[in-house]
Curated annotation (Swiss-Prot):
Residues 50-57, 124-142, 221-240, 298-315 are cytoplasmic. GO terms for cellular component: plasma membrane. This is Olfactory receptor 52R1. Odorant receptor. Disulfide bonds join C100-C192. The keyword Transmembrane applies. It is found in: Cell membrane. Glycans are attached at N7. It holds the Pfam family 7tm_4. Residues 1-28, 79-102, 164-199, 262-276 are extracellular. It comes from Homo sapiens (Human). It is a multi-pass membrane protein. One of its GO terms (molecular function) is G protein-coupled receptor activity.
Length: 315
């Protein structure tokens, strides 16, 4: 392996992504559902963005946050899936060193952004149900833009330090990553130096971002639940629960596989590698596919516009 020398570290020219170790003979076939899922994610999210853009009645906080979620999903899935499919179908296992670090940055930064957008959507739900008459005055377009900017900057700035730290570390001769994409902890395992600070920083970022967002989401839904239970009729309560169920499904689809993958990397040494890697792939693939489907089905305005578009009645 050829090493490139820098001022303070030596790094390999490239890494080798192994894909899914243990399922090498099945990777050709695994790629087909992965490709279909990615295609649905791309088409679904682009359709969602198009519908929100052209329909001015959808220029409200909920749909603006949904547009942010769609953009994040496109970036997140596109940062891993094309390379993953190239590995499975064309055995293109090599990834350049800097491309690997860029992938690490995009995966973790936009995972943070996605979590932040879901938190902002929970706040929107809370204001809409608990303060319906003041919703438009509280969540003005400028407030929505500021929230989106804060969420974006948090993801970019919070993740940058541990990506920078990895770039300054010396790497061992071993260059194989038992994964289908570059992940922070997987890359750290190839470093020939003390990685405790970088590991600690990664833990801090993950727990501070996910912990804060989940606390805000949890508190929002506690207040929402209290408000819904005070509604006079059972039909009104059922309708309120039904309208928020899509957001809860999206939250669970992101956090369950993401937390499983994150905790398994650090503490789940007894979990089979195949199971861990499959979950690590799914958390970057399933939410981007499900989000436009869930919101397209559960949100009447979006569903109607998509149907009109399919019938040729949409500009």
């Amino acid at each position: 392996m050829v090493l490139a020398s820098g001022n303070s570290s030596s790094h390999p020219v490239s890494f080798i992504l192994l894909g899914i170790p243990g399922l090498e003979s099945f990777q050709l076939w695994i790629a087909f559902p992965f490709c279909a899922t990615y295609a649905v994610a791309v088409v679904g999210n682009i359709t969602l963005l198009h519908v929100i853009r052209i329909d001015h009645t959808l220029h409200e906080p909920m749909y603006l946050f949904l547009a942010m979620l769609a953009i994040t999903d496109l970036v997140l899935s596109s940062s891993t899936q094309p390379k993953m499919l190239a590995i499975f179908w064309f055995h293109a296992h090599e990834i350049q060193y800097h491309a690997c670090l860029i992938q690490v940055f995009f995966i973790h930064a936009f995972s943070s952004v996605e979590s932040g957008v879901l938190m902002a959507m929970a706040l929107d739900c809370y204001v809409a149900i608990c303060f319906p008459l003041r919703h438009s005055s509280i969540l003005t377009p400028s407030v929505v833009i500021k929230l989106g900017t804060i969420v974006m900057l948090r993801g970019l700035l919070w993740v940058s330090p541990f990506c920078f730290m990895v770039s300054r570390m010396p790497f061992c001769q071993h260059q194989a990553i038992p994964q289908s994409y570059c992940e922070h902890m997987a890359v750290l395992k190839l470093v020939c130096a003390d990685t405790s600070i970088s590991r600690g920083n990664g833990l801090f970022v993950a727990f501070s971002v996910a912990g804060f967002d989940m606390i805000v989401i949890g508190m929002s839904y506690v207040m929402i639940l209290r408000a819904v239970l005070q509604l006079p009729s059972g039909e009104a309560r059922l309708k309120a629960f039904s309208t928020r169920s899509s957001h809860i499904c999206v939250i669970l689809a992101l956090y369950i596989p993401a937390l499983f993958s994150f905790l398994t990397y650090r503490f789940g040494h007894d979990v089979p590698r195949v199971v861990h890697i499959l979950f690590a792939n799914l958390y970057l693939l399933i939410p981007p596919m499900l989000n436009p489907i869930i919101y397209g089905v559960r949100t009447k305005q979006i569903g109607d516009r998509v149907i009109q578009g399919c019938c040729g009645n949409i500009p």
